[in-house]
């Protein structure tokens, strides 16, 4: 009898542990609905084995307990031969796996080699605390952390109690909770999901929150540009984590058909890239991009080969064959690789996502212009003063930025971001003009403020608005926000606005449980209220795709003071009004955020380049794809692209071959500013005067050459190929005017009488400008042998010889493309490769 009793006890324990393999969620649809929610160490079945979590109480009476599953493997460890390879599904394990402690972080440099300008403020201000989260590092780092609420949170209770807000009808099964996967930032080089505790967000919003570690730096994004190492392994890790969630989250009470990805900084860029990748199709439904897009200068690495060769040379793996170099790097210890100091150009990255033709099929902006959104709902926004770290180096004192420091910073900015030398002076002066407060131009504090706005507008605001506009053009739901609040912390400059990463403590509910080592702020009741507001918006969006529904804004549980967000309805962003929500202590819905400056970067700056192109080039041009990825397949080729917008919108013109330019925003008919009008007027006047000058010069040269030919040609002579006969070159000893002497020297240099004068002097066609906005100056050759055009002979001496080719490290050429080739090593055999 006692044996039978033991068997019955064991059977009951097994049933509490989650049922049989492949079964549903233990104890009912969610942990909070069964006995598991009451256990200290609940056990859940997954497709790969059983995992044991831990129940945690939160430091707030309105928040219920959360079950944490920490360090759940979502992929096979990328060790040995699996380094620089796409991830594989994890192997099954016997028994019960403990998931009660945080997993190791992925290998990264601990010596602060990454420039501070590329990291969030809370990270750089608390480096010692941040270092404690990445002390435990291992190449075996592909793990998830899950935070599962055990009971309905305050938001669900408020929704059910609201008489004017009926229960959400969009939720198919109220027992299944939405899932939110957070992608951490850190310039693709640093960070870990362990830094972000999702417990408060999960408990307050009644959602399952997941964080993850993915491969970083050289181990996550090294690329040779060919099949030896295609790169994007960190992105593939994120896709594998989404596959794991789709397959297993139902066992934890989650809804695999309501998965939202969200991230900040580089994590937000990953969110945008996953939207554009067909490998992630069907794995998530909504996306939140906080302070990051795929079209900023730091989002994509357009020089992967350069930095791979630099790294290989540093560790003794510089080989002529790319496969041999990668194999050598694969044998090196991970610590030796990540500790190498490979510095990128300022405002760029050394190791990050690349356009590989598969995971990232094409330049992200091209994909967005072609509607590669695949029907994702999107919430996107920026902080008020994202560029704080860019300005702190230039601020010499509390009095602000001096005039010389302002000029130097702008010049350095242009030199590092724009690759055509002839137009740099014009662009530099135009930027200074646009970002000078002419009413108070000698005020150092005002110069600091405008410099902060310059970096914020260029690196964050303009790319975010362009992304939202491209998204809305295809009738996809998109909501835009601007974040105008930050917590009070020691050491923070009084003049600083909400900087890069300042929204994160409010998204994760830190004010509700008090200051932490990473966010050592003096949180007030206003901070708690604002955090509740942000979590309500974010989790509403994860539930329905609408941040306003199903839960209304109500924070009376904090204090009796009215919540101003209760009367605010967050409107969708559209291409005409571009509505956005101002998130701060005084919320409001407005339109056309920083419209003048956004138009400057998206319209006037490309227009300045077009004027330069028309002035210095003729009809002889490079092939349209000579300096960028090959064109897409013909329109009739099969694909999964989203259909064009409905007929209710005016059709957008088809892009013409050649250098691209941003499309003008439809409906932007407003008067931008006096400064912008003056700039355009001055530019147009200079263009007109130059055209007149060149016309007169051409006429004068042609007239003199005609007279000279008549003087030098003997009557009735022939034999030179010149009309009228006679030699084209003058007789010995006869002096020529300067402009005729230059023509003579050009003809001699070009091979004498038989040479074509048009072959003597031809400058190159400038590169694609909109890509040059995001590439380092040496990404694209400024002179190419095949791009020759004729300049007037009186303009000056011949130009210098062309510089070396695009990538100075030539031993890694990509293999010749074939019509049927695809990447068999990636998780999916299908591909939209344009090569």
Curated annotation (Swiss-Prot):
Q: Which parts pass through the membrane?
A: 678-698
One GO CC term, this protein? symmetric, GABA-ergic, inhibitory synapse
Q: Tell me the Gene Ontology biological-process terms attached to this UniProt entry.
A: cell-cell adhesion; cell-cell junction maintenance; gephyrin clustering involved in postsynaptic density assembly; inhibitory synapse assembly; insulin metabolic process; jump response; locomotory exploration behavior; modulation of chemical synaptic transmission
This protein's source sits in the domain of life called Eukaryota
A Gene Ontology molecular function term for this protein is: neurexin family protein binding
Sequence segments annotated as region (Required for interaction with LHFPL4): 678-698
Q: How does it sit in the membrane?
A: Single-pass type I membrane protein
* Regions of compositional bias (Polar residues) in chain numbering: 823-835
What keywords are assigned to this protein?
Answer: Cell adhesion, Cell membrane, Cell projection, Disulfide bond, Glycoprotein, Membrane, Phosphoprotein, Postsynaptic cell membrane, Signal, Synapse, Transmembrane, Transmembrane helix
* Disulphide bond pairs: 106-141, 317-328, 487-521
Expressed in which tissues: Expressed in the blood vessel walls. Detected in colon, brain and pancreas islets of Langerhans (at protein level). Detected in brain, and at lower levels in pancreas islet beta cells.
**Where does the signal sequence lie?**
1-14
Subcellular compartments: Cell membrane; Postsynaptic cell membrane; Presynaptic cell membrane
Phosphoserine-modified residues are 713, 718
Which segments carry the region annotation Disordered?
A: 623-668, 790-835
Name the glycosylated positions. 98, 136, 522
InterPro entries reported in the protein's UniProt record: AB_hydrolase_fold (IPR029058), CarbesteraseB (IPR002018), Carboxylesterase_B_CS (IPR019819), Neuroligin/BSAL (IPR051093), Nlgn (IPR000460)
Task: Give me the stretches of Pro residues compositional bias.
Answer: 630-658, 795-818
Q: What does this protein do?
A: Transmembrane scaffolding protein involved in cell-cell interactions via its interactions with neurexin family members. Mediates cell-cell interactions both in neurons and in other types of cells, such as Langerhans beta cells. Plays a role in synapse function and synaptic signal transmission, especially via gamma-aminobutyric acid receptors (GABA(A) receptors). Functions by recruiting and clustering synaptic proteins. Promotes clustering of postsynaptic GABRG2 and GPHN. Promotes clustering of postsynaptic LHFPL4.
PANTHER family found in the cross-reference section: NEUROLIGIN
Q: How does it assemble?
A: Interacts with neurexins NRXN1, NRXN2 and NRXN3. Interaction with neurexins is mediated by heparan sulfate glycan modification on neurexin. Interacts (via its C-terminus) with DLG4/PSD-95 (via PDZ domain 3). Interacts with PATJ. Interacts with GPHN. Interacts with MDGA1 and MDGA2. Found in a complex with MAGI2 and IGSF9B, where it interacts with MAGI2 (via WW 1, WW 2 and PDZ 2 domains). Identified in a complex of 720 kDa composed of LHFPL4, NLGN2, GABRA1, GABRB2, GABRG2 and GABRB3. Interacts with LHFPL4; leading to mutual regulation of the protein level and synaptic clustering.
Please report which protein family the annotation says this sequence is part of. Belongs to the type-B carboxylesterase/lipase family.
Q: Can you say what this protein is called?
A: Neuroligin-2
UniProt organism field: Homo sapiens (Human)
């Amino acid at each position: 009898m006692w044996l039978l009793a033991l068997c019955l006890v064991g059977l009951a324990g097994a049933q509490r542990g989650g049922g049989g393999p492949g079964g549903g969620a233990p104890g009912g649809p969610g942990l909070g609905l069964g006995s598991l929610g009451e256990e200290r160490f609940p056990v859940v079945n997954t497709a790969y084995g059983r995992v044991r979590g831990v129940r945690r109480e939160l430091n707030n009476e309105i928040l219920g307990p959360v079950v944490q599953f920490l360090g759940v493997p979502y992929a096979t460890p990328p060790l040995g031969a699996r380094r620089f390879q796409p991830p594989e599904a994890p192997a099954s394990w016997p028994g019960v796996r403990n998931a009660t402690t945080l997993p190791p972080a992925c290998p990264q440099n601990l010596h602060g080699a990454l420039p501070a300008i590329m990291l969030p403020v809370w990270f750089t201000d608390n480096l010692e605390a941040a270092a404690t989260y990445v002390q435990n590092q291992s190449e075996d780092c592909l793990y998830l952390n899950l935070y599962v609420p055990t009971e309905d949170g305050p938001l669900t209770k408020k929704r059910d109690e609201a008489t004017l807000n009926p229960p959400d009808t969009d939720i198919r099964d109220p027992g299944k909770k939405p899932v939110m996967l957070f992608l951490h930032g850190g310039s693709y080089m640093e960070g870990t999901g362990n830094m972000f505790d999702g417990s408060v967000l999960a408990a307050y919003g009644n959602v399952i929150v997941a964080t993850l570690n993915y491969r970083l730096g050289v181990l996550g994004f090294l690329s040779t540009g060919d099949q030896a190492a295609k790169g994007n392994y960190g992105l593939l890790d994120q896709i594998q984590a989404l596959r794991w969630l789709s397959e297993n989250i139902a066992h934890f009470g989650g809804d695999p058909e309501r998965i939202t990805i969200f991230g900040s900084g580089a994590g937000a860029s990953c969110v945008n890239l996953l939207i554009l990748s067909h490998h992630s199709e069907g794995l998530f439904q909504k996306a939140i991009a906080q302070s990051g897009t795929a079209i900023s200068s730091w989002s994509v690495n357009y020089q992967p080969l350069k930095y791979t060769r630099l790294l290989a040379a540093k560790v003794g793996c510089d080989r002529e064959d790319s496969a041999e170099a990668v194999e050598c790097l694969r044998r090196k210890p991970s610590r030796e690789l990540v500790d190498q100091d490979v510095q990128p150009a300022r405002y760029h990255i050394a190791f990050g996502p690349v356009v590989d033709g598969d995971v990232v099929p094409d330049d992200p902006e091209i994909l967005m212009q072609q509607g590669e959104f695949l029907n994702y709902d999107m919430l996107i926004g920026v902080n008020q003063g994202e560029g704080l770290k860019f300005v702190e180096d230039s601020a010499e004192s509390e009095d602000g930025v001096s005039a010389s420091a302002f000029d130097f910073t702008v010049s350095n900015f242009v030199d590092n971001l724009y690759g055509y030398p002839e137009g740099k002076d014009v662009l530099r002066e135009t930027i200074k003009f646009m970002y000078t407060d002419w009413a108070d131009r000698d005020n150092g504090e005002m110069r600091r403020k405008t410099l902060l706005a310059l970096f914020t507008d260029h690196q964050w605001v303009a790319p975010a608005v362009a992304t939202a506009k491209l998204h809305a053009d295809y009738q996809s739901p998109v909501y835009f926000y601007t974040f105008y609040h930050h917590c009070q912390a020691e050491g923070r400059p009084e003049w600083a606005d909400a900087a890069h990463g300042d929204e994160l403590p409010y998204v994760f509910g830190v004010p509700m449980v008090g200051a932490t080592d990473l966010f050592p702020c003096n949180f007030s009741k206003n901070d708690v209220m604002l955090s509740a507001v942000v979590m309500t918006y974010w989790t509403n969006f994860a539930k329905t795709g609408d941040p306003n529904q199903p839960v209304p804004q109500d924070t009376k549980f904090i204090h009796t003071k009215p919540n101003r967000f209760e009367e605010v309805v967050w409107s969708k962003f559209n291409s005409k009004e571009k509505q956005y929500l101002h998130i701060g202590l005084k919320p409001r819905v407005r339109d056309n955020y920083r419209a003048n400056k956004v138009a400057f970067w998206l319209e006037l700056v490309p227009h300045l380049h077009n004027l330069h192109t028309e002035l210095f080039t003729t009809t002889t041009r490079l092939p349209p794809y000579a300096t960028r990825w090959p064109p897409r397949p013909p329109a009739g080729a099969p694909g999964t692209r989203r259909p064009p917008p409905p007929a209710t919108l005016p059709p957008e013109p088809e892009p013409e071959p050649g250098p691209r330019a941003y499309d003008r925003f439809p409906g932007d008919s407003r008067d931008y500013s006096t400064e912008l009008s003056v700039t355009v007027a001055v530019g147009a006047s200079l263009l007109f005067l130059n055209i007149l000058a060149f016309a007169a010069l051409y006429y004068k040269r042609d007239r003199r050459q005609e007279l000279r030919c008549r003087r030098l040609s003997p009557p009735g002579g022939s034999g030179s190929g010149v009309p009228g006969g006679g030699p084209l070159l003058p007789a010995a000893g006869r002096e020529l005017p300067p402009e005729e002497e230059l023509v003579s020297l050009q003809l001699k240099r070009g091979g004498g009488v038989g040479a074509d004068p048009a072959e003597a002097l031809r400058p190159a066609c400038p590169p694609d400008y909109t890509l040059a906005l995001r590439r380092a100056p040496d990404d694209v050759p400024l002179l190419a042998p095949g791009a020759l055009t004729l300049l007037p002979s009186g303009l000056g001496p011949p130009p210098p010889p062309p510089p070396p080719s695009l990538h100075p490290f030539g031993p890694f050429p990509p293999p010749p493309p074939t019509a049927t080739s695809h990447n068999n090593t990636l998780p999916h055999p299908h591909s939209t490769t344009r090569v």
